[in-house]
C-alpha cells in the first residue's frame, strides 16, 4: 500500500496546470489500447488452445486491472485538486471515465482468467457452432473497440454518435448467441462447464463494450469541458 501511494505521489508531482489534460487523457487512452490488445489476443489464443500465451495474457490483464484500480483509488482526489481552476464538468467526466475504465479492466481480467483456467484444466473444447457464434461476436466487438480507440487516440469524436448503431448490433449478436447456447444446453449438446464459460465470455464481452463506450463518451466530454 505504501508503494502504491508513493507511485501516486510521483504522478501527482508531474502534473501541472498546463499538462493536466494531456496527462489524464494519455492515462485513459493507453489503458484502453492495452485492454483492446489483451482482449483480442486472449480470444485468438483461446481458439488456438495456446495455454502458455493464455497464462501470460491472464497475468497481463490482472496487472492492467490492478494499475487501473490504483489510479482509481489514489489518483482521483490529487488530480481533482489540480483541476481546481478548471470547470466542474472536467472533474466530473474524468472521475466517470476512470470509473468506467476500472470496470472494463476488471471485466477483462475475469474474462482472461476464466479462459486460461478452462484451458489449463483441459476442459472440452468449444463445438464448431459455439466457435462460429463467438467469432461473430468477437469480430463485431473488435471493430467497435477499434473505432473507440481511434477516437481516443486522435481526440476526434465526430463519429461517436454513429457508433450507436454498431453498438446495438453487437448487443443483438450477444443476445442471439446467448439464446443459441441456452438451446444447445437444453438439448445436452454441450457440457456444463463449456456452457458456463461460453455464457460468461459473452456477458463479459457485452459488459466491456458498454464500459468502453461510456469511458469514450466521458473522455470526449472531459476534453471538451
Name each region found by the language model:
Residues 1-225:
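Cytosolic, long alpha-helical scaffolding segments
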Amino acid at each position: 500500500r505504501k508503494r502504491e501511494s508513493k507511485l501516486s505521489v510521483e504522478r501527482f508531482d508531474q502534473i501541472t496546470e498546463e499538462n493536466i489534460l494531456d496527462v489524464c487523457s494519455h492515462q485513459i487512452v493507453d489503458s484502453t489500447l492495452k485492454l483492446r490488445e489483451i482482449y483480442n489476443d486472449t480470444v485468438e489464443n483461446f481458439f488456438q488452445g495456446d495455454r502458455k500465451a493464455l497464462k501470460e495474457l491472464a497475468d497481463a490483464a490482472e496487472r492492467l486491472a490492478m494499475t487501473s484500480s490504483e489510479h482509481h483509488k489514489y489518483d482521483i482526489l490529487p488530480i481533482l485538486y489540480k483541476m481546481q481552476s478548471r470547470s466542474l464538468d472536467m472533474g466530473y467526466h474524468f472521475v466517470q471515465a476512470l470509473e468506467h475504465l476500472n470496470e472494463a479492466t476488471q471485466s477483462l481480467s475475469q474474462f482472461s482468467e476464466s479462459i486460461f483456467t478452462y484451458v489449463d484444466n483441459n476442459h472440452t473444447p468449444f463445438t464448431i457452432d459455439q466457435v462460429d457464434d463467438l467469432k461473430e461476436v468477437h469480430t463485431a466487438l473488435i471493430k467497435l473497440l477499434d473505432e473507440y480507440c481511434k477516437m481516443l487516440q486522435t481526440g476526434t469524436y465526430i463519429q461517436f454518435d454513429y457508433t450507436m448503431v454498431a453498438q446495438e448490433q453487437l448487443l443483438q449478436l450477444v443476445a442471439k448467441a446467448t439464446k443459441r447456447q441456452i438451446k444447445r444446453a437444453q438439448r445436452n449438446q454441450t457440457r456444463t462447464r463449456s456452457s458456463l464459460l461460453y455464457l460468461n465470455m459473452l456477458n463479459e464481452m457485452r459488459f466491456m463494450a458498454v464500459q468502453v463506450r461510456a469511458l469514450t463518451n466521458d473522455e470526449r466530454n472531459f476534453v471538451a469541458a
